[in-house]
Amino acid sequence: MASTIMAAASRAVVAKTPFLSGQGRAASASPLRDIAAATNGRITMGNDLWYGPDRVKYLGPFSAQTPSYLNGEFPGDYGWDTAGLSADPEAFARNRALEVIHGRWAMLGALGCVFPEVLQKWVGVEFKEPVWFKAGSQIFSEGGLDYLGNPNLVHAQSILAVLGFQVLLMGLVEGFRINGLDGVGEGNDLYPGGQYFDPLGLADDPVTFAELKVKEIKNGRLAMFSMFGFFVQAIVTGKGPLENLFDHLDDPVANNAWVFATKFAPGS
């Protein structure tokens, strides 16, 4: 059984997937299809089922049944598509890829929004400004912007240089992921794997890989909502997420979404 699963996974992973190319959902686009066939169509994580027709579903308040095109072959498919956004195979393939990529960046972004406040509060790392939406403005100060508050690490004084360097780094990673360069990817532009994208071999086992996909998409969705919450907090309270959390814990009645929503006025 194990050899059958690994063979099926290998055949599926090597095949090129058309996530952003507009080619629709080809037969090779989902490694899970072949894996599920080798395991009688059931891949379970704990006591729950996340794939196939018997998976956990959430239809929402306006859907009577799961659409036929949402058959549970992809991670994070709860059968909910009231607006029919996934009815077109090409749009579905593109939107699914965009969701995964945005979820990954949101997870990194959410960590970056909280981590400086944590370091300054509990580790003792001194930042000129630990709050995420205020930190960038430090580059315009006389001393410039220091990475981790240490001028001996990365000292930035040019906003154009910072933007250019960020575009270069993100572009290289995305280019490697999409093009599948030798030694970088395995031909799958959404889950490239290989020594650079999976150096610990976490996805070597196909069943574990299927579970990790579910965990990734669920945490990615949560991170995207978290980032949206951070944006709203920044506009309404002018404070970072950690400070807002402690304010709420200190006085939940005076510091909550309802109170701020009823008192908020733009520009105040």
Swiss-Prot record:
Binding-site residues for chlorophyll a 1, renumbered to this chain: W80, S86, E99, R221
Gene Ontology biological process terms in this record: photosynthesis, light harvesting
Residues where chlorophyll b 5 binds: Q166, F264
Lipid bilayer topology: Multi-pass membrane protein
One GO cellular component, as annotated: photosystem II
Binding site for chlorophyll b 3: S158, E174
Primary localisation category: plastid
A GO MF term: metal ion binding
Binding site for chlorophyll a 4: N219
Residues holding chlorophyll a 5: K215, Q233
Transmembrane segments: 105-125, 153-173, 222-242
Compartment annotation: Plastid, Chloroplast thylakoid membrane
Family: Belongs to the light-harvesting chlorophyll a/b-binding (LHC) protein family.
PANTHER family: CHLOROPHYLL A/B BINDING PROTEIN
Subunit structure: The LHC complex consists of chlorophyll a-b binding proteins.
The protein's name: Chlorophyll a-b binding protein of LHCII type III, chloroplastic
Organism: Hordeum vulgare
